[in-house]
Amino acid sequence: MLYPIGIQDFESIRRNGYVYVDKTALIYRLATTGRYYFLSRPRRFGKSLLVSMMEAYFSGKKDLFEGLAVSGMEKDWTVYPVLRFDLSGEDYSRPDVLDAVLSRCLKKWEDLYGVPERSSTLSSRFKDVIEAAVAKTGRPAVVLIDEYDKPIVDTLWDENLSETVRVQLQGFYGVMKAMDGSIRFGFLTGVSKLGKLSVFSGLNNLKDISMDARYSDICGISEKELRKNFADSVKELAHANGLTEKECFAKLTEMYDGYHFCEKSEGVYNPFSLLNTLDSLHFRKYWVSTGTPSFLVKSLIQGNYRLAEMESLQVPESVLSGVYSRKPDVISLLYQTGYLTIVGYNPATERYTLGYPNKEVEDGFTDTLSEYFTPVRDNWSELSADKFVEDIRRGDVQMLMRRFTAFFADMDYRIQGKAELYFQNTMYVMLKLLGQQVAVERHTSNGRIDILVQTDRYVYIIELKRDRDPQDALDQIDEKGYDWPFLAGDRKVFKIGASFSSATRRLENWSVAE
């Protein structure tokens, strides 16, 4: 089987025999029930292939759709002039790049449709191209814009350039509304909606299908599609890894499934990781390894977020919809870029629960955070990690705390922010890296445990204090009864009070009680 890894051209996939998961029935529904749409999905989720397929459909290339669902639905196969803008391939952090990209696209169509004289502005040129396309073909135009937000994301940390880009795109996209009578269909995709309100203020007739249950699997691969299209591939993967087919499906689900884009939808697989796994016959972090955007980590750290909350975060729909015009909200960005997904919904409060979609994302994001929260010398990873794990498994709490002390003393302090949160986040990331069952701010009937680590033999209750005696932390554990839920079991409970210095950002002292 040929897997279209990195291939985003629909015609190439169909003509060269690559496997294609049929999404054409959904495109027919869009084309026959509305005119202007917006879709947000994470990177490498098949958005560009979707747009390419739309381009082929509206170009009337009937032969490419033979055997697909739409071949039995579409009767006319009308050829429309298609104007497709792909904004994904450039770095817009430099001035004038956006001008050059848009101008290059427009010039192609100006030559094709014979625009007699070029206007001075990009917006005017776009308008002239639409008019010329309609005049020459006698049919309304189709406008497809792939990765509308790439110029915005690339300039987030340059306020002046970001504002210039926003104003420019606002005027450019607004042409679609002004030329409504000359447009048959419009479709825009992107990773995020961080500029949706301000950039699209001139184009307020877009229907956002990002959280529409009818289109929840328009990108990505569902469980049903996996079993229908890749049954033999999964058998081969199972054999190569010494697994039964049932075990192999379960591991694929654990690693790459779990994306939900509305409150009532089946999970979908990350197509990039899934196809790479089936092709290479190895389970790896393919999607995460392509790079976590640095602006996400910067936003998370600067926002003083408690990292453990990323595993189960309660938010209103406005966060998922990205109703933030200029200043991006980091939780909204983490959801829209695929690092968090919907894992629950409470209709009474109308709040969504967000969490990591799968093991690949959770482990990979922890690895990325470790570069910021554990930036110590190489001897940490090479010499000490296994020893931390052994200390935890053996219940050697004194040695464990000595290692923590040495760890913080050896750190390169690049992280700023609230001291208590800094220590808590750092210990959380460390313990997650070590593969431990760790909870932060674990709720009890009388309060919240700062850090809770559990193994099959031991329970570690860690209370952190800044610039105070560690005995104060132990007293709080006793007064609040943090150990009560574990006293009836067979596991040994360690109560640890740890004191950090806000001046040196080191673990200064600790006390242990059993």
Where are these regions (language model features)?
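Mg2+/Mn2+-dependent nuclease catalytic core
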Residues: 163-167, 466-483
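Conserved catalytic cores of phosphodiester-cleaving nucleases, focusing on short active-site segments
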Residues: 427, 449-466, 480
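Phosphate-binding site recognition
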Residues: 1-419, 434
